[in-house]
């Protein structure tokens, strides 16, 4: 019986893993639903301006848009700058 329990537990773990992955995807989609359409272009424009002065990758700029029930919108911008000298 322990051999059968082993195979049954794998299916249960696989199903719970698939459920967890689906919940993550749904949560990500829901979080992206409320973002403005201009946000990707805004991120690219900000990255272009920063690149005029500092050599950074696109992964170094994180843009997050949050809006609460009181219609208060917050645009959060995190830029990881390298420890190099600026290019002027």
UniProtKB/Swiss-Prot annotation:
It holds the Pfam family MinE. The keyword Cell cycle applies. GO terms for biological process: cell division; regulation of division septum assembly. Keywords: Cell cycle, Cell division. The keyword Nucleotide-binding does not apply. Coiled coil: none annotated. Belongs to the MinE family. Prevents the cell division inhibition by proteins MinC and MinD at internal division sites while permitting inhibition at polar sites. This ensures cell division at the proper site by restricting the formation of a division septum at the midpoint of the long axis of the cell. This is Cell division topological specificity factor. It comes from Pseudoalteromonas translucida (strain TAC 125).
């Amino acid at each position: 019986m322990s051999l059968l329990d082993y195979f049954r537990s794998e299916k249960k773990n696989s199903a719970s893993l698939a459920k967890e992955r689906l919940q993550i995807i749904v949560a990500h989609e829901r979080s992206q639903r409320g973002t403005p359409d201009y946000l990707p272009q805004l991120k690219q424009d900000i990255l272009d301006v920063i690149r005029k002065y500092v050599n950074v990758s696109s992964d170094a700029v994180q843009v997050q848009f949050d809006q609460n029930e009181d219609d208060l919108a917050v645009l959060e911008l995190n830029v990881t700058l390298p420890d190099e000298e600026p290019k002027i």
